Amino acid sequence: YEDPAYSIIECPNLLMFGDTAVLIFSPNEEVQVRIGHIGDTGRLELSMSGYTFDGGGWQGYYAPQTLKRKADRFIQWGWMPEGARGQVPEDAPLAEREARTFDWAGVLSIPRELTLDASGRLNIVPIPELEALRGEQVQMAETTLVQDLTALPLKGLQIEFMAAFHLDPDARIEISIFRSRTGEETILRYDAGSCLLELVRASSSLDPHTAREPLSVLHPLATDGLLQLRVFLDVST
């Protein structure tokens, strides 16, 4: 497979779902997926337009690797680079440079299970085994959100958060994550008009060297206006 849009195609994963071939690769930016079949020449012939597999790239999800379990079960981990936290300048004080982050380090993402849906596109969900790690559960009754801040009864550093929102076509919602008394917060924002799901990191830390640029991905809203989110929070990256 060749793609003139990229000068680098690395860390390829070729998955076979019957006769359908799924190629996942890392082009030194957001991870991409291409779907088709292997032709008589041994090349991948696409059956649909390619698209971004994960919008994190070097800022959160790169160089994923996939293993196959029995019954065509594909499980994937991605690299969450430590450098995504930000870099300490070379001319910074020694104490700061000694505590700097390194591009080659990081952690692995939570494992994902990959399947094909009826339209032939790739479905990506956290593996169900993660549910065994759940502890205390908090449930919030259905409520109507207004423009003012609605506090959620959640505290902690390891949280699995699931929510469903019925949105108007021009609505925008924001979820403030890890709010602190000193003003730190990370915002998960969704704009129904632009279908943009965005992680806003401008105020994530008081550390001036922390990465602050937003991460975003297009996420079309369902025709009935339903937005469903499942968010895993911790302090690993």
Segments and roles (model prediction):
Residues 32-38:
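Beta-propeller blade termini and top-face loops
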Residues 1-4, 10-15, 19-27, 73-82:
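Hydrophobic core segments of beta-strands in well-ordered, beta-rich domains
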Residues 27-30, 105:
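Short, solvent-exposed loop/turn segments at conserved positions within beta-propeller repeat blades
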Residues 31-32, 84:
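Short gly/pro/ser/thr-enriched loop/turn and capping motifs at secondary-structure boundaries
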Residues 2-5, 55-57:
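Surface loop/turn motifs at the tips and blade-to-blade linkers of beta-strand repeat domains
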